[in-house]
A protein has these predicted regions:
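Two-component/phosphorelay signaling modules centered on CheY-like receiver
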Residues: 10-28
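Conserved phosphotransfer cores of two-component systems
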Residues: 41-43, 67-74, 95
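Active-site beta3 strand of CheY-like receiver
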Residues: 43-49
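Receiver (REC) domain active-site loop signature in two-component systems and cognate sites
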Residues: 54
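C-terminal output helix
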Residues: 87, 105-114
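The C-terminal output helix
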Residues: 115-131
Length: 131
């Protein structure tokens, strides 16, 4: 899968990017929602993983932009955050996000989620080809 990862924490961004590449994915990195928006003007992706709280264009506003103004409106979207508190969960719920994973969750959690999303995308592609 081609995955866009968006996070203002450069260290996390680099580690996540390398991790996903090791698992066979093509990865595009962006340091905030504004940069990610520019990426989507040029690239089609299969999955977006975005931090919730970032400068310039936060995850919630970036998610809204993706859903309303891009060809990526139906692309699965995972919010990630180092915060796992009530405020963060409210932002996630209010954003009508597909998935949320805490940055403190075991790496296997995100791997399983990405694998499940990839499997669902493959099944949809097969179903579309049949019709």
């Amino acid at each position: 899968m081609k995955i866009l990862v968006v996070d203002d924490n450069k260290g996390f961004l680099d580690v996540m990017g390398e991790f996903l590449k090791e698992h066979g994915h093509k990865v595009i990195l962006a340091e905030d929602g504004k940069q990610a928006r520019e990426v989507l003007e040029e690239e089609k992706v299969d999955l977006i993983i975005s931090d919730v709280f970032m400068p310039n264009l936060d995850g919630s506003r970036f998610h809204s932009y993706v859903r309303e103004f891009t060809d990526s409106a139906t692309v699965p979207f995972i919010f990630i955050s180092g915060y796992d508190d009530e405020h963060t969960r409210k932002v996630v719920v209010d954003s009508d996000i597909d998935f949320f994973v805490s940055k403190t969750a075991p790496v296997e959690t995100i791997v399983k989620l990405i694998d499940r999303i990839g499997s669902n995308l493959s099944q949809k592609a097969v179903a579309t080809e049949r019709h």
